[in-house]
Design a protein with these regions (language model features):
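His/Asp/Glu-enriched short active-site or ligand-binding loop at hydrolase and phosphoryl-transfer sites
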Residues: 165-190, 210, 241
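A ligand-binding cleft/hinge motif common to bilobed small-molecule-binding domains
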Residues: 81-90, 205-223
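Short helices/loops that flank or line small-molecule/ion binding pockets
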Residues: 63-69, 193-202
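Bacterial N-terminal signal peptides
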Residues: 1-3
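Sec/Tat signal peptide C-region and signal peptidase I cleavage site
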Residues: 5-9
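A short, structured surface patch at a secondary-structure boundary
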Residues: 14-68, 72-79, 83
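Extracytoplasmic substrate-binding proteins
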Residues: 10-14, 83-159, 181-186, 237-270
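Short secondary-structure boundary segments
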Residues: 19, 77-78, 100, 155, ...
Length: 270
């Protein structure tokens, strides 16, 4: 696996994009005509969904990837499994894993890495600078909103058990950029919480990925949960839902996500 961008890209390379933010960056760079396929998480822009889908980024099969005959695979960090990457390397396919992170600087690094893998470094510098300036403006505006609301990001509630974000996650990163305070700081990653722990966190806002459907019914069900029913968020009905890729992708659209979340947090403050 090539970590970084030492690949010598060719204009006629058949490129496979793995990871929604990688695909977005390729489109933002104007290099989409080189794409031959994408992974399941690559749902934006909408036209990307017309490309063949080789499967979920963390559960790729060698057969699925090889079926689209790529010369170059550009993947988000965490793509795999490792056994699949080993097979692709043995098949002499260039595999570039781009760095990931959950802050402003990391987005620029990711854009530059994708651009370098494609051999369009200058365009990458321009895009990185444009996104960075836009994000700096959005972040500064979000920081003027007053007392940061305590935000609990819930990844899932399967079986009534709340799986929440701690630190060092995309959710924690976007909450901070948008002027919020992550309610959970006791652990890294995503872990289940006891009902008592959720109640003690006293979140002002519940943040979730938008999975479509009837939100009014979903909100009622959410706040009927014993752990959430007495929280400040339940008392004000403050739940914010956003498309998962927009919110957690950390790519060219992150300034848009920050502005939308900041506005939602302002509304929650009243």
């Amino acid at each position: 696996m090539i970590s970084g961008t030492s690949v010598q890209a060719q204009d006629d390379d058949r490129v496979l994009a793995i990871g929604g933010s990688v695909t977005e960056i390729i489109y933002a760079l104007g290099q989409q005509d080189r794409l031959v396929a994408r992974d399941t998480t690559s749902s934006f822009p909408p036209e990307a969904e017309a490309l063949p889908d080789v499967g979920y980024m963390r559960a790729l099969s060698p057969e699925g990837v090889l079926s689209v005959n790529p010369d170059l695979v550009i993947a988000e960090a965490g793509s795999g499994p490792p056994e699949t990457i080993e097979v692709l390397e043995e098949a002499a396919i260039n595999f570039v894993m781009v760095p990931d992170g959950y802050d402003r600087a990391s987005i620029g690094e990711k854009i530059r890495a994708v651009a370098a893998a494609l051999g369009v470094d200058a365009a990458g510098e321009d895009l990185a600078a444009e996104v960075d300036a836009d994000l700096a403006e959005a972040e500064a505006a979000a920081a003027t909103g007053g007392t940061p609301p305590r935000v609990l990001f819930i990844l899932s509630m399967q079986g009534g058990r709340i799986l929440a974000s701690g630190t060092d996650t995309g959710a924690a990163g976007i909450i901070a950029l948008a002027g919020g305070e992550n309610a959970v700081t006791e652990f890294d990653g995503y872990k289940p919480l006891t009902d008592e722990a959720v109640t003690a966190l006293a979140p002002d806002v519940i943040l979730m990925m938008d999975r479509q459907g009837d939100h009014s019914a979903a909100d009622a069900e959410l706040f009927s949960h014993p752990a959430l029913s007495t929280t400040p968020a339940a008392q004000t009905g403050s739940v914010v839902r956003m498309d998962g890729l927009l919110m957690l992708g950390f790519g060219p659209r992150t300034p848009e996500a920050v502005r939308a979340l900041s506005a939602a947090f302002d509304e929650a403050r009243g």
